[in-house]
Each structure stands twice: as C-alpha cells, then as structure tokens.
Amino acid sequence: SLTGVFPSGLIETKVSAAKITENYQFDSRIRLNSIGFIPNHSKKATIAANCSTFYVVKEDGTIVYTGTATSMFDNDTKETVYIADFSSVNEEGTYYLAVPGVGKSVNFKIAMNVYEDAFKTAMLGMYLLRCGTSVSATYNGIHYSHGPCHTNDAYLDYINGQHTKKDSTKGWHDAGDYNKYVVNAGITVGSMFLAWEHFKDQLEPVALEIPEKNNSIPDFLDELKYEIDWILTMQYPDGSGRVAHKVSTRNFGGFIMPENEHDERFFVPWSSAATADFVAMTAMAARIFRPYDPQYAEKCINAAKVSYEFLKNNPANVFANQSGFSTGEYATVSDADDRLWAAAEMWETLGDEEYLRDFENRAAQFSKKIEADFDWDNVANLGMFTYLLSERPGKNPALVQSIKDSLLSTADSIVRTSQNHGYGRTLGTTYYWGCNGTVVRQTMILQVANKISPNNDYVNAALDAISHVFGRNYYNRSYVTGLGINPPMNPHDRRSGADGIWEPWPGYLVGGGWPGPKDWVDIQDSYQTNEIAINWNAALIYALAGFVNYNSPQNEVLYGDVNDDGKVNSTDLTLLKRYVLKAVSTLPSSKAEKNADVNRDGRVNSSDVTILSRYLIRVIEKLPI
C-alpha cells in the first residue's frame, strides 16, 4: 500500500487493495451527503460516535482509502463529533464509509454528474406547482397529478370595488398553500434567473419533462416563463403601473387537492415592494428571453418601464392593505432593497444612465453591501450581484470596490462558519422558519465571490451547504422530498396531504429545524419546520445549477494561480516574480505554467507579473486579459 501525508493536517492515509472482512451494519451516526460528491472537491462525513480509523469502501468491498477522523465539539448540536475527510478519493464509483466500532454509512456516489438527477427533481417540483392547469408526472414509479385548478383567477373587488374578473392564471402555487404572492416570487424568480446568467452554458442543454420541452426555448427558461406569464397579469388594469401584492383566497383553504379549492380568489391591493419586484423580474425576463422570443421580451420591458415610472413618481414605502385576508402577508419592513434591485435590473437590460444613477445612489445608502443571510424580505444582494458582474461601462469604481470588498468578506465569513461547524452548515447556529432555504441560498454569495476572486474554498463551502441538506446534518436525513437518505415523508403541502398517496410530491426542500438544530419534526402539521416554498426551492435550484454539466477545476485553467493551490493571491505573485527573475527554475506543474500566462501570449514573463499585480490590487477586474 501507499502511505502519505494528507494536506489538511498531518494525518497518515493509506490506499490499499484490501477487502473489508468485518460485516458492518448501517449506523445513522455516520452522516454525509447521501447524493454524493464531485471529484477533485471536498468530501467530508460527520460521525457522531467515538472513533478513529475510517475506510472508504467500494460496493464490492474493496478498501480504497484509510483515514483518521479528527474530533471537534460542535457548538450548535452540543456534541463531540468526528470529521472524516476523504477529499483525495476522486475515482468515479459507488462507495460507503466503514467505521470500526460504529458501522457503515449509506452508499454514495462520486461522479461528475452526481447532481444532475437532484437538479431535475427540484425543477420537477416547480413544474408540479403550476397553477391554472393540470399537471402530471411519474417519479420513482409513482404517478402524481391534479386537474386544472384556479381557472377563475382573479376577482378585482379589492382593487376597484367591482366583482369583475381579470385573468391572472398561470404561475406557481407559493408553498404549502395554493395562493400566489408577488414578493415571494421576487426572490424566487431572481434566484433562478441569476442561476441562468451565472451558469447558462451548463443549464441550456438540460432537458426537463415539461409540456413545452419541444419548443425552441431552453426548458429551464420555459419553466420560468410560466411564472412570468402570471407576474405580467399583476399590474393594475388602470395602466398606473401599480402591482397587486398577491392573488389569494380570503383565508387559507383546507388540505384538499388544488382543483377542489373553489373559494373565490382576489387581487390584493398594491404595495411598493411588489411593484419594485415586478420591475426587477420583468426587466430580467426581457433580456433573458430576448434571444428566444423578442416579442415576449418587448412585452416584459414595456411593462417594467410603466411600473418603474410609477415608482419614481411615488417614492413612499406603501404596504398592501391586506385587512380582508388572513393568508401570507409577505410585508417587508422597507422597500429600499426592492427599489435598488429594480434599478439594477433595468440598467443591466437597457443601459440607460438614469437607472445606473438610481442604483448607485441607492447602493450608497447601504452600509453593508452584501448580507450573508437574505431572503424575500431583503433582495438587495440580487441587485448588487447584477451590478458587480455587469460588463456595461460607466460603473463607479469606488462603489464597485466597496461591493467587492463586502462580497469577499462575507464569503470568507461563510467559509469560516462552515469549516467551524460540525456538519458544515454555512448558516452556523442561526435558525428560523425556512432556514434551510437560506443555507442553500448562501451558495449564491459563494459562487459570485468565486467569479470575482477564484478560490476553491468558496466552491467547497457551496458544496458543504448542499451536503448539509442532503444528509450531513444532525438527523442523517435528506431535507428534500424524494431524494437522498430517509427524506421527508409528511411535508406541510396540501397536495401531499390530500392525494391519498403514501409518498409526498417530489423535489421539495422543507424549511428545517427551529428554534434549534434538534427541532425539526417530519409531520404535516409542522408548517414551522416542514413546509415547502418556491423561494426555498429556487435557492436549492441555484445551488445545484452550479454543479450541473460541471467541469472540474482540475481540468480548467485558473489564470493567476501560479502555485496551483486553487486560489489567486499575493503568494502567486511572489512565486511568479521569482520564476521570471529565475530565482526558481520551475513552477509546480504544467497547469501552473498555463495559469501563469495571464495575458495568454504563450510566454511567461514580466508582462504577466505586471498584469497579475494589477489584478491583485483590483485595477484589473478579470483574468485573463
């Protein structure tokens, strides 16, 4: 066997062709990502039992890796746990962890495409939430369907005092209930459109089982269009640009199938937050659909302009009058974040200086540019990301720098939080209703940071967040229906409770435990911990999108990473200077030589030193040039 030093901390490791001889039994104290892992990235398990040695074992019993687990006290769950790090196992296959004196884990895969099915299942979940139509799908041999629902959406009584109807069909049911809320659509659509813009080449070829699968629009965007079609109906019929806050029954309905809910549904009066979120969503839709359906794009941007103009002339934060309704309020404390996001998306789509100035003036009012913890009630991050990654000219360099600094500081903080948590939870010890959604939403911060300043720590922390919701948690359970180890069976979801089928509808992330890590209960009545929601699912979709049709960085050139450690920093500049001055004769690898050629002229010389130094002080925004 081969013996060596594992880089994360002088631990002896062995690679051996020996076979497991002991009969290990499954033990739920060995907690890991039951979906699996990507080659050349972090792979960790948490063992809630006293142990030392662990083995990574192939399905046929061959031991491919022997390691020593390291102990730590988890301040969150208040238990001593042992971390098994097997990141150096990269051969594709199916494995399990065997821990002497404890037992074995669930089987898991190591593969480049390990998240493809999970991504498609989360997208299937969105399709199955469609309102105003019938839906039908077979998953794991079980058929899920319902008939056309809510085809009378919606009445205008609370808008104009008349019991008349304006079409507001389509869109997704929001959560465990069947209502439709513009403000929660904001973070949902924004997250999914950003997934498209950040990972377009990876998502464009993905085939989904949806009715529109044979048209000329990518399937991922087809699903989003179904929601935008509804969003467009939410403008007031008077042409003012005001946007209704939601379409809803007066009270929450019972646990019945959607086609059996016949209570009248109404447009609920406008709010400034809903109007601003409408602007942002339709502005994004305009630029994203333009290559595929220019007429639709034009419809979207024209609607966005009308509502933006209204907001400009009506600067006050206006809350929706929801006095006739007991359904979800989605009432934001402030609309400053919504208006900032609207300005960013209008500028990115149209390029007019008016929108740029609006965004920059608003962004200057935010003392913290990037928040680690964000959801429907704080969408400022979405606008900051769009502005920061925009290739349009005219940005304020000082503001760009301020947002970058905040982004990288926040991303670094998330990495530290994950590394110091016994289960790699990126949100640390913070818990509230729907916190699982935030855990996977934080991958957005990490991925944008990785675009601005490539760092494998950011990518691995994003994978930690995914691992947490698929089994590396206190329960050793997946938090996503239909996926992974022992997933939720009783979500707070009216379809799952009313259809007479034992298995819940698939592809939904449940909210997770609160007020603490041990407070999740898998029962239908626990809306506090076991509800589903489009904003949480969209966050999961973003998290998984980054690793669909993924190319391992092992094979990619990371310009500026002269020492080939997966990061670009001052250490690389020092090595590059020494190499150019011939103080060292070689770079660590052939990949490092490619990484060092930051101007791509086929040579490594003083020009590369100059460019890399300017990049590190952020005079240059991107490598290579």
Curated annotation (Swiss-Prot):
Species annotation: Acetivibrio thermocellus
Pfam family, one: CelD_N
Active site: D177, H492, D522, E531
Names of required cofactors: Ca(2+)
Primary role: This enzyme catalyzes the endohydrolysis of 1,4-beta-glucosidic linkages in cellulose, lichenin and cereal beta-D-glucans.
Enzyme class: hydrolase
Protein name: Endoglucanase D
Family recorded in the similarity comment: Belongs to the glycosyl hydrolase 9 (cellulase E) family.
Source lineage: Bacteria, Bacillati, Bacillota, Clostridia, Eubacteriales
Phenotypic consequence of D519A: 91% of wild-type activity
Outcome reported for the amino acid change (mutating H41A): 79% of wild-type activity
Record carries keyword Zinc: no
